[in-house]
Amino acid sequence: MNLVMALLTNTALASLLVLIAFWLPQLNSYAEKTSPYECGFDPMGSARLPFSMKFFLVAITFLLFDLEVALLLPLPWATQTTNLKTMLIMALTLISLLAISLAYEWTQKGLEWTE
């Protein structure tokens, strides 16, 4: 019973704080607060310019491959384990996954910058 009361109290308090944080800034809105900010200078253009979807997809692909390569970093220390065969199988599986992913991106023209 005490756990249920604590959970309900915490949920209610968290919900109340979220609602306050959402509605309180909307009550005090003025032009300077809603204007774009560019390093202390007056903005050169609109802050809501559209960006290239191709750039976004290449950036996401880079992040995914970067995270997968980061999984390869502990491999030199993993060679010191007693079960070397399992480590080699896992490493080759990860490298194969990277190669297959790169080949797929290449065939789908996901790495092409121009169309």
UniProtKB/Swiss-Prot annotation:
Annotated GO CC locations: mitochondrial inner membrane; NADH dehydrogenase complex
Keyword NAD appears in the UniProt entry: yes
Membrane topology field: Multi-pass membrane protein
A Pfam family recorded for this sequence: Oxidored_q4
Subcellular locations according to the entry: Mitochondrion inner membrane
Example GO BP: mitochondrial electron transport, NADH to ubiquinone
EC numbers on record: 7.1.1.2
Keywords: Electron transport, Membrane, Mitochondrion, Mitochondrion inner membrane, NAD, Respiratory chain, Translocase, Transmembrane, Transmembrane helix, Transport, Ubiquinone
Gene Ontology molecular function: NADH dehydrogenase (ubiquinone) activity
Keyword Membrane set for record: yes
Role: Core subunit of the mitochondrial membrane respiratory chain NADH dehydrogenase (Complex I) which catalyzes electron transfer from NADH through the respiratory chain, using ubiquinone as an electron acceptor. Essential for the catalytic activity of complex I.
Family listed: Belongs to the complex I subunit 3 family.
Record note on quaternary structure: Core subunit of respiratory chain NADH dehydrogenase (Complex I) which is composed of 45 different subunits. Interacts with TMEM186. Interacts with TMEM242.
Protein name: NADH-ubiquinone oxidoreductase chain 3
Source organism of this protein record: Hippopotamus amphibius (Hippopotamus)
Lineage, broadest ranks: Eukaryota, Metazoa, Chordata, Craniata, Vertebrata
Underlying gene: MT-ND3
